[in-house]
């Protein structure tokens, strides 16, 4: 900011005449006053400030869409009604690529005979589907 603009005024844009006295108006001198008012109390209670740990780069981490086998088991009849799955030889054939789902996880119970096509299966999901008489087809 150009100080010339404020020449002729008593306080040069600093508010009242009291405001620019001492270092109290800017939280101390130098690097003092970098923290807020209750910082010491927070430190005594053990709160941690600053950066801690490791954050995975965004390029490395991927956000995939998932579904659990329990949800597939419940939704199989509705998917057939909607035309998103079909029943062949007493088994529900579900192609998850068409639904935009990339991975099947193993939470829940499987009671129906499911033939599921997906890019990835967790070990527990594959085991549960095959124990119920179904099969897992890896899409490429």
Swiss-Prot record:
A cellular component annotation (GO) from this entry: cytosolic large ribosomal subunit
Gene Ontology molecular function: rRNA binding; structural constituent of ribosome
Taxonomic superkingdom: Archaea
Region of interest (Disordered), ranges: 1-33
A Pfam cross-reference name: Ribosomal_L27A
InterPro entries: Rbsml_uL15_N (IPR027386), Ribosomal_uL15 (IPR030878), Ribosomal_uL15/eL18 (IPR021131), Ribosomal_uL15/eL18_sf (IPR036227), Ribosomal_uL15_CS (IPR001196)
Bias type Gly residues, positions: 24-33
GO biological process: one example: translation
Alphabetized UniProt keyword annotations: Ribonucleoprotein, Ribosomal protein, RNA-binding, rRNA-binding
Family: Belongs to the universal ribosomal protein uL15 family.
Alphabetical list of PANTHER family matching this protein: 60S RIBOSOMAL PROTEIN L27A, LARGE RIBOSOMAL SUBUNIT PROTEIN UL15
Function in brief: Binds to the 23S rRNA.
UniProt-listed HAMAP family: Ribosomal_uL15
Subunit structure: Part of the 50S ribosomal subunit.
Protein name as annotated: Large ribosomal subunit protein uL15
Native organism: Methanosarcina mazei (strain ATCC BAA-159 / DSM 3647 / Goe1 / Go1 / JCM 11833 / OCM 88) (Methanosarcina frisia)
Upper taxonomic lineage: Archaea, Methanobacteriati, Methanobacteriota, Stenosarchaea group, Methanomicrobia
């Amino acid at each position: 900011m150009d100080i010339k603009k404020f020449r002729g005024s008593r306080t040069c844009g600093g508010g009242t005449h009291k405001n620019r006295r001492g270092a109290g108006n800017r939280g101390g001198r130098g690097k003092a006053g970098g923290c807020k008012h209750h910082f010491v109390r927070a430190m005594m209670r053990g709160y941690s400030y600053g950066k801690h740990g490791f954050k995975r780069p965004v390029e490395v981490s991927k956000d995939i869409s998932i579904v659990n086998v329990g949800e597939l088991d419940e939704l199989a009849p509705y998917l057939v009604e909607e035309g998103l799955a079909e029943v062949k030889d007493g088994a529900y054939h579900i192609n998850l690529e068409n639904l935009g789902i990339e991975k099947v996880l193993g939470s829940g119970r499987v009671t129906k005979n499911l033939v599921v096509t997906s890019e990835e299966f967790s070990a527990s999901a594959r085991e549960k589907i095959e124990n119920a008489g179904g099969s897992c087809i890896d899409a490429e």
